[in-house]
């Protein structure tokens, strides 16, 4: 635990498409994890007696989603609505972590290949709107790799809104070989909703969508051999599981359990024409210098909530083995804490004494402007 008496302890804030993970450097897990969502009343005056609050953030917004219209300011990993994003940050610092920004350095995370103007805008907001004394922006996949104790490897980072394969050599991401796949948790939840309709269960409202997400997280898994698993599902009920809905009704889910995340390997199931996560990983490795490929094949690190399905590492291993040169040694690493490994990597980095010179200070920002971020964070 960090000693909160020490006012200079850094804040680590990982802004994902689906969830914000925030806390203090040196801690082993984020203190605050809440949905990246901002809600505003659909109709003026509906919420009388609630001090007419005009915006709700995170869990507060989720809980009132019936009367609010919800907006997600991060799309596919990249901030697209700065006003709402600022509200999320404000909520993070003042309501969740309850701190004074001017007393702490802050480490933020960004998606790989985040546009330059976005990094500058983020820097500007931290210094000008929140008055942080110093800041740093780390690439999510690189932080995940650090948290696994490596500095070289390829990270498959898959969250709620986007997936990336990021080859990293001695601590630096190789931008020319990074690939982005617009397929992630949200798409899987949507697909599960669709295939459950075949059973006659319909989920349309955002509240019901949350139920489907929960079913996905609790019951889905990845088959090592999809065809074989399908066969097993038709001949026996061994894979059937039950799930109790909030209203007490009990539903049964069978083949859907592995059909849903199969999309990660067979994107054609949802009508996409792109490579699955295994092929994208392989393509990323092939874009790298031939001399470092061996190091990448031997250090394939999974990261993010959408890599949490049981069976994913075995299947990934099997698929990469089928693509790679025959004698290549392949290792797929699925760290148990990978749901939060980006945050954990940030926590480790920001608490190293050797990291001190890396912070961008307010003085440097005042002198050089937002572009300073490209010189110090890469």
Swiss-Prot record:
Subunit structure: Polymerization of globular actin (G-actin) leads to a structural filament (F-actin) in the form of a two-stranded helix. The binding of profilin to monomeric G-actin cause the sequestration of actin into profilactin complexes, and prevents the polymerization.
Name assigned to this protein: Putative actin-5
Its job: Actins are highly conserved proteins that are involved in various types of cell motility and are ubiquitously expressed in all eukaryotic cells. Essential component of cell cytoskeleton; plays an important role in cytoplasmic streaming, cell shape determination, cell division, organelle movement and extension growth.
Organism: Arabidopsis thaliana (Mouse-ear cress)
Keyword DNA repair in record: no
Compartment(s) where it occurs, according to its Swiss-Prot or TrEMBL record: Cytoplasm, Cytoskeleton
Keywords in alphabetical order: ATP-binding, Cytoplasm, Cytoskeleton, Nucleotide-binding
Gene: ACT5
Note: There are 8 actin genes in A.thaliana.
Gene Ontology cellular-component terms listed: cytoskeleton; cytosol
Principal location: cytoplasm
Signal peptide (residue range): none
One matching Pfam family: Actin
Family: Belongs to the actin family.
Gene Ontology molecular function: any one: ATP binding
